[in-house]
Swiss-Prot record:
UniProt KW Membrane keyword: yes
Protein name (record): Flagella accessory protein J
Disulphide linkage map: none
Organism of origin: Methanococcus voltae
Keywords assigned by UniProt, alphabetized: Archaeal flagellum, Cell membrane, Membrane, Transmembrane, Transmembrane helix
Topology in membrane: Multi-pass membrane protein
Name of the coding gene: flaJ
Length: 558
């Protein structure tokens, strides 16, 4: 029942009725009256269908919100169990531990709110920790988190210490997270097939829109515009669906202040965008205004591709920094376990052990370790030193887990145990990421292939339509048959060519954004994918124009 779901998503029945149901009902009544008074035919049916969407959205909101909260819990469960386990080996009592988890909203997201609920039950309502866990286990949106709370309640009742329970739960919860992650990757494969099918179908629809005006009394520009509009809607829906299904797994850090690498990438972005703007002005002014003979011979598709080429520079620099960040992540677990074991064995502070480790080679991470040692040796603020270390690596995972380690040792936890927990879970996350990168690379290859396939389909159809239009224009058609033959003005046909190429540019934009959305990397790399897809589309389009012009002897504007 919907009333049973409302408390689980933090809504009171009264608030739900006033904020969602009542406005939807009033808006629906208004649209029904409007539809019957001012519209008729198909337009009336469309207007009368809108109230169904509004009422369906109001009734389905609690279920959508419940699923959203479940997704937010499951995608951060690995961070939660790692931080919970690491902090449990400190000198904090259970209440202080829950209070600390409840304020980590940036790291834990919805799980911080779930921890706050347990803390409120224990602190303000004087409930036992086991009873509070059982109470929340029956109300949390995530069954995985609910099972974890049930197990924790049982272990506490049986007299087991919390840190012992959490040490044993690390593998269990991480395996559950791995299952959740792998299911998301499997759904990504399904979305890949859906994406290919949808783009292929829309391409044929645009092709039909090009040919149909010769057979039916429809305007060319209108048909192609409608087809492109539908194409854009489908692209947005697919991107939104994929974005909601993918787990939160970003690569880049979330620091407030830009690092040296961030400033470097921003500099290259400004340079590449500036060169693109300059090249666009020079090339298009020279072709269409100055009408330079050399540029007039070059198809407009290649002119646009040349103008967009400088964007590859900014994208390539970001991709190179991404690869360095990934290498840093691969070296981080080994460094942290070495540091924790060294500190535990010597029984001393972190500074001496870190100074020794800085002499070893940890790949690209070594430079950041030297900077960390230099900050810690000043002995001003150790917490900020570790925080800046995480930001300087530009890795979200290193930022997250290095701060966990620092917090544990600061609160009196055993550095060796903390480093082993973090290092083990870190490696599991890296293994899952490798699978994701492989899937995303396959998806990117499909998108590159589709960009060429779309260009071939659209411009081959355009060549056929241009040939038919030229044939109709050259015939001496009797006046009685003029209404049966549809001829397009040459200027309109050139405009349709630009619209089709614009469709390919929109596809390149959406696909390049989608690639970086899926792999969680720096969005500046999408410039490299965009420029590459533009070149593929342009070359295929130009070659297709030349072939159709040669085979069909069609006059296709360049």
């Amino acid at each position: 029942m919907i009333l049973d779901i409302l408390p689980r998503v933090g809504l009171k029945p009264k608030d739900y009725f006033l904020k969602f149901v009542l406005p939807a009902v009033l808006a629906s009544l208004f649209m029904v009256v409007l539809g019957f008074i001012y519209f008729d035919g198909i337009t009336r049916l469309l207007v009368l269908a809108l109230p169904l969407l509004l009422l369906g959205g109001a009734l389905g909101y609690p279920y959508i919100e419940l699923d959203s909260q479940k997704q937010k819990i499951n995608e951060r469960l690995h961070v939660y169990i790692t931080k919970f386990g690491v902090l449990s080996i400190t000198d904090l009592d259970n209440k202080a531990l829950l209070e600390l988890l409840s304020v980590e909203k940036e790291e834990l997201g919805q799980l911080a709110e779930e921890s706050r609920k347990i803390y409120v039950l224990v602190k303000r309502w004087n409930q036992s920790l086991a009873g509070s866990c059982r109470f929340l286990a029956n109300r949390t949106p995530s069954s995985q988190f609910g099972d974890f709370l049930d197990r924790m309640a049982y272990s506490i009742d049986s007299g087991q210490e919390l840190k012992e329970f959490l040490a044993g739960e690390q593998d269990i919860v991480m395996d559950e997270y791995a299952g959740f992650y792998e299911r998301a990757l499997y759904s990504l494969d399904n979305f890949k097939e859906m994406y290919v099918s949808a783009i292929t179908s829309v391409s044929f629809f645009v092709t039909f829109a090009i040919i149909a005006p010769f057979l039916l009394p429809y305007d060319f520009v209108t048909m192609v515009t409608v087809a492109i509009f539908i194409f854009m809607i489908i692209e947005v829906i697919l991107i939104y669906s994929i974005k909601n299904k993918l787990p939160y797994d970003r690569l880049w850090h979330t620091g407030e202040k830009p690092t040296a690498i961030d400033r470097k990438l921003r500099k290259w972005l400004i340079i590449s965008v500036g060169l693109t703007i300059l090249a666009s002005i020079v090339l298009f002014w020279g072709k269409y205004i100055y009408e330079a003979p050399q540029l007039l011979k070059i198809p407009y598709e290649l002119i646009f591709s040349i103008a967009m080429t400088p964007l590859m520079l900014g994208g390539y620099m970001a991709q190179r920094e991404e690869s360095l960040v990934i290498r840093k992540e691969n070296n981080f677990p080994d460094f942290l376990r070495s540091l924790g074991d060294s500190v535990s064995a010597k029984g001393g502070g972190t500074l001496e052990s870190l100074g020794y480790l800085c002499t070893n080679d940890f790949g690209p991470l070594t430079k950041d370790l030297v900077a960390l040692h230099r900050r810690l040796s000043i002995r001003i603020n150790g917490q900020k030193s570790w925080k800046y270390f995480g930001h300087d690596t530009c890795s979200y995972l290193i930022q997250l887990f290095s701060e966990m380690y620092e917090r544990c040792t600061y609160l009196g936890g055993n550095s060796g145990q903390a480093s082993h927990i973090i290092g083990k879970n870190f490696r599991k996350i890296l293994r899952l990421r490798r699978s994701k990168y492989q899937n995303v690379n396959q998806f990117a290859g499909v998108m590159y292939g589709l960009s060429g396939g779309m260009a071939l389909t659209l411009f081959a159809s355009y060549g056929v339509a241009s040939m038919v239009n030229g044939l109709y224009s050259s015939l001496d058609i009797p006046d009685t048959m003029l209404s049966m033959v549809h001829v397009v003005a040459p200027s309109d046909f050139g405009f349709i060519s630009y619209m089709m190429y614009g469709t390919l540019i929109i596809y390149a934009l959406c696909s390049s954004y989608l690639i970086k959305l899926m792999d969680g990397g720096h969005y500046q790399v999408s410039l490299l994918h965009f420029s590459t897809m533009v070149w593929i589309s342009s070359i295929v389009a130009v070659v297709t124009e030349m072939v159709t012009n040669s085979l069909l002897k069609a006059t296709i504007p360049v």
